[in-house]
Amino acid sequence: MASQSLIQREQKRKKLEQKYHLIRRSLKKEISKVTSLNEKWEIHGKLQSPPRNSAPTRLHRRCFLTGRPRANYRDFGLSGHILREMVHTCLLPGATRSSW
């Protein structure tokens, strides 16, 4: 189980990313439209002004049961360990155990 501080930090990053999403997108569109190098540098400086944690690359996908940041399946929102346990206890309908 991930510590609560890490989970809270991730939630804070998600809120910041949503808050600054439109600003970042509009600045990136401006950069692509501008041809002058000096103007691009000015816009790039503005793009660096929002907080670092508002960047979408800082977000991690976490298991919603345990908070584990690794081995997550997008379709389920679960980590591999929890997914395997749920399949073994027949809590996920339609999922079958592989055998070869």
From Swiss-Prot:
One record GO biological process: translation
PROSITE patterns xrefs: RIBOSOMAL_S14
Annotated GO CC locations: chloroplast; small ribosomal subunit
A Pfam family the protein falls into: Ribosomal_S14
Compartment(s): Plastid, Chloroplast
GO molecular function: rRNA binding; structural constituent of ribosome
UniProt keyword list: Chloroplast, Plastid, Ribonucleoprotein, Ribosomal protein, RNA-binding, rRNA-binding
Function: Binds 16S rRNA, required for the assembly of 30S particles.
Similarity field: Belongs to the universal ribosomal protein uS14 family.
Subunit description: Part of the 30S ribosomal subunit.
HAMAP family: Ribosomal_uS14_1
Name of this protein: Small ribosomal subunit protein uS14c
Upper taxonomic lineage: Eukaryota, Viridiplantae, Streptophyta, Embryophyta, Tracheophyta
